A protein has these predicted regions:
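Regulatory cytosolic signal-relay segments
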Residues: 1-18
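Hydrophobic residues at beta-strand termini and immediately following loops
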Residues: 8, 122-123
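Acidic loop->beta-strand submotif enriched in PP2C/PPM serine/threonine phosphatases
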Residues: 15-32, 90, 123-169
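Short, function-defining helix-loop hinge/capping sites that tune catalysis or transport
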Residues: 28, 46, 97, 117, ...
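Active-site-proximal, acidic helix/loop segment immediately C-terminal to a metal-coordinating Asp/Glu
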Residues: 42-63, 149-200
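Catalytic core of PPM/PP2C metal-dependent serine/threonine phosphatase domains
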Residues: 47-117, 124, 187-200
Length: 200
């Protein structure tokens, strides 16, 4: 089995540091988890928030805590630390070799995309960011591990690209066009999405 992970990132215009943090952690019972958090607003304060959330989550995952429980614990910690005044989005994408599934954990209004052959599914059921209350629960989707399965995970910067000009980025259409034209590597797919967003 081969797992490929690709990341593409650019700083927000006129901001020295983004609020995004991404880490990969090995799961003690086999597999890997990719943890992506985005702190509210931008700059050092947002970065500190996303780093705190990611540290909490990867620490718990490394101890064998389930993804949903790790997300809830991170939300409670953020709510307690910031008194409910700061939010943070969170996505966890896990390859769980114990259950033989892909586990998608979302506390993020921004959708995830699942690509399998010619089929592209958008996971856009409304999800609440971390830190808004003490009882925040993530949305969890489990998929069987399959060859050529692609999970597209992103922060809201991609979603909001082009909105001010009235031409918001259409992630689904970009994915469809890229996947139809070629058999792109994960890095090519990530770079293409980012390039289209920057162009807008």
């Amino acid at each position: 089995m081969e797992l490929q992970i690709a990341v593409a990132k650019v700083n927000k215009y006129a901001v020295s540091e983004s609020g995004d943090t991404l880490e990969v952690v090995e799961r003690p019972n086999g597999g890997l988890s990719v943890v992506l958090a985005d702190g509210q607003t931008s700059g050092r304060g947002a970065k500190a928030v996303s780093q705190m959330v990611v540290r909490k989550v990867i620490g718990l995952l490394a101890e064998g805590v389930r993804d949903g429980a790790a997300a809830r614990a991170a939300s409670d910690a953020l709510y307690t630390d910031k008194h409910g005044k700061v939010i943070c989005t969170l996505n966890i994408v896990s390859l769980d070799l114990q259950s033989r599934t892909i586990v998608l954990t979302r506390n993020n209004p921004s959708p995830l995309y699942i690509c399998q052959g010619e089929q592209i599914d958008k996971l856009d059921i409304e999800s609440v960011p971390l830190g808004v209350s003490r009882d925040v629960r993530p949305l969890i989707t489990e998929l069987p591990i399959q060859p050529e399965l692609i999970v597209v995970n992103k922060t809201d910067g991609l979603v909001h690209a082009g909105e001010r000009r009235g031409t918001p980025v259409n992630v689904g259409e970009i994915l469809r066009a890229t996947l139809e034209d070629q058999a792109p590597s994960p890095q090519t797919l990530a770079d293409t999405l980012l390039a289209q967003a920057v162009r807008l």
